[in-house]
Each structure stands twice: as structure tokens, then as C-alpha cells.
Amino acid sequence: MSDYEEDTRPPPNIETADPEDTIKILLATDNHIGYLERDPIRGQDSINTFREILQLAVKNEVDFILLAGDLFHENKPSRDCLYQTLALLREYTLGDKPIQVELLSDPDEGKAAGFSFPAINYEDPNFNISIPVFSIHGNHDDPQGPGVNGALCALDVLSVSGLLNYMGKFDLPTSDADAATTGIAVRPVLLRKGSTKLGMYGVGNVKDQRMHFELRSNRVRMYMPKDKDEWFNILLVHQNRVKHGPQEYVPEGMFDDSVDLVVWGHEHDCRIIPEPVAGKNYYITQPGSSVATSLADGEAIEKHVALLEIKGKEFQLTPIPLRTVRPFVISEVVLEDAAEEEGLDVNDQMEITKYLKQKVNDLIDQAQALWEERNARSIEAGDEEIPPMLPLVRLKVDTTNVTQTSNPIRFGQEFQGRVANPRDLLVFHRSKKAGKRGAGKVDIDQPELSIDDPDLTVSEKLAKVRVKTLVREYLAAQELQLLGENGMSDAIQMFVEKDDIHAIQTHVNKSLKTMLKNIKSDEVDEDDLDDLLAKAKQRQEEEYLEATRAGESAKGKGKAKATDDDGGAASDDSMLMDIDTGGGATFNMSDDDDDDEPPPPPKRRAATSRATTTKKAPAKAPAKKATTTTARGRGKKAAPPSSDDEVIELDDDEDEISEEEVVAKPVKRTSRAAVLSQSQAPAKKAPAKKKTPARQTQTQLSFAPAGRSSRAAASKARSKMVFDDDDDDDD
């Protein structure tokens, strides 16, 4: 709530009433005429309530009606909507009743350009106005469109017809140069009745960011008479009162101290009792809408208009409930709580439907009781009884941890003829925040991150921000059961930093596929499945960490290298594979690799020698056999987390090949190794590669000194070629 609630000032009141000096005003806002006008049930709700407001003005013999925006729901009201509005204004605002408020300001201020009639309708001798209506525009009926006469709105039409006085319209600067020096100029409508002087300052709806800027910059200029302390000043605004963003609202304490009362439009919940503002002399009244345009909690508050009486610098406000507003009740149920408290079976859809029907029936009975109570008050006050109306009912259903739910539209069909909104009777939703699992555990949605340390300065926090670190901490809070946190972290980093859109999907698919293969081969019982998965995940994590640190894991050496670009044991080869633009040596991604631990010295530079070693002629035949073992090793090693999607694709193909089948084709594999070993740089163009053409491009990345056995070197060169080619395919 706002700070004004701390103000202990008593409600405003007029000590001695004097009709000759008291200005009586009927306050209303957000009528939204035309809302759901095509709905067969609710189509006439807004116009019926507007008719009641005009009738209340006549009944209470007010001096005029004051509206704070959104008279129409649509920016371009329909012909039928305009017809009914004009007819009602003519019916209730024209007549022989004399106007007792004197206009002191210029009657031509704001009049239609090029015409002689005044802006204030009761100053026109051709009209016989009994109750003037003053209104500003809202965000629904604001001026739009360029034209000869500038931007126009529906209120301009009512104004030139002589049935309404449009105020609060101003032109904003059209150029940046003018915007720097020109603000919002608010010119008042000055009225007097007896000894009471009233100044009305209307500010039609402006985008909240712009209004916030103008107020912060003190660029809202209110033109006031010289003896401003003798005037009672009312300010009409139509802006966000609730904070929706840093600048998407208007602070309550931003208005001038000379204002006595702020009439706030746009907010639909009724807070019509004047509320003081801490540190300010003025009060705020928020009449709220006269028709429910959304089935929200704020709309369920009883709708009111107000009778405002002003004498000198004193005022008092009397709320008047609206009888023609359709009754609206709203409630919420949590199925999970109902299961605990009432024994509801959340797995039985029929039982859930029966439970929800009972809740809706209770709400209908509640709405009926509300309607009867309202009618009883009206009859006591001497008003006519209003025929019953179908109520608006909204039941919000929290379906967290519930899988069986009803169809909302089909559910509402059973209440056809009993409620006014059968199609949106139910609204299903789930809780956004998960409950705490216990003390000491990290919250899933808001884990304790290392950058949240209160002892760190802003610069230190920014310096510690790393994708790898943040992802790892979030994944730790999720408590993954199948995927390893390290491998998933690397896959996400590949996705973020290197635009590898398939990294995450490929890593997940590969890990799950390998795990399923292991489970099928072991043929374990379902009771032991969780333990097996936990052990498999732990084994994957251990192998992954070992591979990333050593870079020479016997089973998944190439795969570990391909995904190890996060620092730690990352080698120069891994940088080449990750970028893959032909000039891998020119890339330096180590800036992002300083997250958690400093990388060890580049002792594995010898790894680049593996491809060069393939030049040796005796290494051809052994290279084929070594390659076969390496391929199968990569297939089994697919379970450790990885971010190299192409490697997974190649491994999937090789996993289906048995060892005997691979050995049965030693000649072709040996010939490819020979071609690669004899022509390193030109091998990129070698067309002889038909089965795995991507491997041909690896020759340009094959460079290293000799110093290892031809068998091992050829095997590692082959493994290195596969992963480098995968990066090429990804680009």
C-alpha cells in the first residue's frame, strides 16, 4: 500500500453547509460505454449503468457531472453506441433547470477551430443545458489520427454536438527540439458559485513514461489565477496508479501543492473514499469503473459513484452504490489443498469436476444473496426494484501437481442460463513458485548464486559473472537425475557463446540414448532403476571430469576435447574444433574460460601432433584398426556430458557398426588414412571420401611433430579429425 495510509488526517468534511455557496458534483469515471456490446447477455450493461449515473445526477440535483476518462470503451465507438450515448445525454442534461455555477475562464478556450460557438455548452445561447457534463479523455477514447483539424476522438464529436464539455486536451511537441523545452500546459476551467471558487484542471491520458518524465522534470505547467489560495483546485488524471514498471505509473506525490483533490481515473478498483497523501495537502479519490471489463479481484469490489460537495476550501464526498451493475463474485480453490483437507482424489477427473461444480453453485448462491441485499437497500431508499440479472462468476483453480482437469468451455455449458459468462467460468493455473524443500537447500527458481554475496561490490559482481558459473549453480539447484551438470553447463555455454543452436538438444539426446542402452544391456528390475541411473550419472560425471582434465581419456578422448572449451584443461585443439573457420589458431576464447579455476599449462600441445603422425607409411594399416577401437570408444563414451552435436551424430552412425564389420573393411579405411597422411593441406579438396566426407576437411588441421608410435598417433589423429569435422558441419 502507499505511504498515504500513514497519514492520520480525519476524513474531509464541511462543517456548515450552505446550498448557496456549495457546489455539488457527481463524480464518475471509466464508464466504458460499448463494452461487449455484441454480447447477447452483457451487451447493454455499460449503457444501463451510464443511464443510472445520469439519473443519479438528476435525483441529487447536482450542478454538473465530472468524468475522469474512458467514457467509451472503443476509440471509434459504433454507430449504435454513439446513438445511445447522445440520446441519454440529451434526455438527462438538457432542460429548463438554471445553471447556478458561473464560468469565469474564457469560454472559447479549447473550442473547435474555425467555428464561433464556445467550448462550454451552457454558454451557448442556442442550447438549454440543465446539467453540464465535463470530461477528459482516457486511454481508450484518446485523440487519434492526423487531419485538417488535428487528432480527434469521440469526445470531440460530443463536444461539437453541444452535449458534453471536453477538457484536458493538449498538443504534445512533435519534434525533439520542441520536446526539450515544451512541457504539458494545463489550463483550468474556472467556476464560481456564491463565495466558492472552483478550478478544474484536466489532464487527458498520456503515455505513462511521458507523463512520468514530464512530472519528474517539473514540466507540467498549471495556469492558475493570481489569488490561487482562494480557489479549490481539482485535478483530473487518467494514468496508472499502480506501479507496473520504473516509469509506467504516476507517483501519487508528484502533483503540485496547490491541488486540493485529485480525481484518479483508469484504475478500475473502487477506492472512492478520499485518501490523504503523506507529505502533501491534497487527497486522492479513485471512483473506479462503472462496469467490469475484466474478471479480476479488483472488479469484484462494489461499484460506486460519488457526490462531491465543495464549499470554500472544504469538501466532503459521499459514495453512492450503483444498482445496475451486474453482480460479480470471484473465488479460488487449490486442488492440492482440497485433497489434503477434504480428501479429494486429484487423479479422478469426474470427482474433480463434481467438486468444482459444487464450488460454482456456492458462488451463484452468493451472487444471488448479494443481489437481494442490494435490492433491499434500494427499496428502503424509495427506489424501484431492479429485475434480477445473471451474475458474473469466476473460479480460479490452482492445478499444481494435478494432471486431470476439466475442459473449461464444456464445464461452463452446464451453467448456461445461470451465469452471464459460461465460457470463461473456470480459469486453470499453476503456482509459479515451488515451495521450499527444506532448510539449507537451494531454491529452484532463486538459487543462492555466488554473485549474490552481499560483501561484493557491483564491479566485483560484474567481474564474476560467467555463463558457465551461473548455469552450473542453477543446474545444481535443479538436482538433475539423468544429465550431468558439467556436461549440460558446457552445452549451454556452447549455445550461448558460439550460437550452436543444437548443442543442448544433441547433448541431451546423446546422453539419454547411451543411458538407455546401458539399462537395456544390464536388464535390471524397475526397483533398481533409480540406483542404476544414479550410478550411471555419477560414472558419466567422473569420466567427463577425467576427460576434461587429462584430455586423453581412453574411451572418449575426442569427445571430451570437443566439449572442453570452458577452461580448466582446455587445449588449443579444442579451440580449433569449437570455432571451425579454417583459422582456428587465431581464436582466443580463454577470456570466458577463467570462471572457476585457472587452466593448467598447455602441456598437451603434443596433441596437435597426432594428425601429422599419420604421414608415416607403416601407420596406415594400424591406423585403421586403432580407428575402429576409437570409434567404438567414442560411442560408449557418449554418455558423458558434451556440447558437440556433430560428434554425436557421427558416433550414432558408428555405434551401429559392429567391430567385425569395421575390421572387415580395412583396405578402404587404410587408403583414406594414407590419403590424409600424404596430403595434409590439399586433402580438404579430396573427393574420394564418400562415406564420411567431413573427415576430408580435417587434413588442414592436422599439424604436429612426430614423437609417438604410428599406431597411437594414427588413432588419435583419426579421433581428432572426427571432432573437427563435426564443427565444420555445424557452421
From Swiss-Prot:
Keywords from the named record: Chromosome, DNA damage, DNA repair, Endonuclease, Exonuclease, Hydrolase, Manganese, Meiosis, Metal-binding, Nuclease, Nucleus, Telomere
Any single Gene Ontology cellular-component annotation: chromosome, telomeric region
Native source species: Coprinopsis cinerea (strain Okayama-7 / 130 / ATCC MYA-4618 / FGSC 9003) (Inky cap fungus)
Binding sites annotated in the UniProt record for Mn(2+) 1: 30, 32, 70, 268
Catalytic site positions: 140
A Gene Ontology BP annotation from the UniProt entry: mitochondrial double-strand break repair via homologous recombination
Primary location recorded for the protein, binned into one broad class: nucleus
Protein name in the entry: Double-strand break repair protein MRE11
Main function: Core component of the MRN complex, which plays a central role in double-strand break (DSB) repair, DNA recombination, maintenance of telomere integrity and meiosis. The MRN complex is involved in the repair of DNA double-strand breaks (DSBs) via homologous recombination (HR), an error-free mechanism which primarily occurs during S and G2 phases. The complex (1) mediates the end resection of damaged DNA, which generates proper single-stranded DNA, a key initial steps in HR, and is (2) required for the recruitment of other repair factors and efficient activation of ATM and ATR upon DNA damage.
Quaternary structure note: Component of the MRN complex composed of two heterodimers RAD50 and MRE11 associated with a single NBS1.
Family that this chain belongs to: Belongs to the MRE11/RAD32 family.
Top-level taxonomic group: Eukaryota
